[in-house]
């Protein structure tokens, strides 16, 4: 019921179409407002300066890196303690193969992501493949608002409003809020729910 991009399972490998469309390509159907960069006249230097760059066949962290605590519980599936082992958002965010404790960020530097072991991306033999943008031609648009953001904002508003109603909470609204969040969870964890 929601016009979200989904992941594709091809021969045991997850092709993360949602990441590619939203962060690799520009102006996806899920995008509501994006800052535009063309990679030559306007380069996304925010990514190059603060997040990471890809040069010399490696992701190199800049001023920001992923807090190791977000991946300390990566072996489990418990969103309260950080990313779970089946959560595509982890490999969309950080370069797990880095030997550094604080992993370099890959979001906006990587243009595509694929994973051969989606049921446990924390395994040493899980192969995560990225297509990347170079520092000198980073054309990654910066999504300010996406459909996923609006879905989460709506679910949060439903939950907060109904919390004030106590026993009179609207069960239909609560179901709608749950469906919104669950749709995003299923997209990010295809190994748990199938494709």
Language-model-derived ranges and their functions:
Residues 2-162:
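Elongated scaffold/linker segments in the mid-to-C-terminal portions of large proteins
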Residues 164-171:
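Intrinsically disordered, low-complexity Ser/Thr- and acidic-rich flexible linkers and loops
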Residues 191-194:
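Boundary/linker segments of alpha-helical solenoid repeat arrays
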């Amino acid at each position: 019921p929601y016009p979200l991009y989904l992941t594709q399972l091809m021969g045991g490998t997850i092709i993360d179409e949602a990441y590619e469309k939203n962060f690799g390509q520009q102006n996806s159907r899920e995008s509501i407002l994006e800052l535009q960069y063309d990679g030559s006249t306007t380069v996304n230097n925010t990514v190059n300066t603060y997040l990471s760059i890809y040069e010399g066949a490696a992701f190199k962290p800049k001023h920001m890196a992923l807090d190791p605590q977000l991946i300390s519980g990566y072996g489990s599936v418990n969103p309260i303690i950080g990313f779970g082992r089946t959560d595509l958002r982890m490999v969309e965010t950080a370069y797990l193969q880095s030997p550094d404790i604080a992993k370099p960020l890959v979001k906006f530097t990587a243009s595509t992501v694929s994973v051969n072991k989606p049921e446990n991306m924390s395994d040493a033999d899980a192969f995560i493949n990225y297509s990347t943008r170079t520092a000198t031609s980073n054309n990654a648009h910066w999504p300010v608002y996406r459909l996923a953001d609006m879905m989460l904002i709506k679910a949060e508003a439903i939950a907060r409003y109904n919390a004030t109603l106590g026993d009179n909470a609207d069960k239909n609204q609560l179901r709608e809020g749950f469906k919104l969040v669950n749709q995003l969870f299923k997209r990010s964890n295809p190994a748990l729910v199938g494709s």
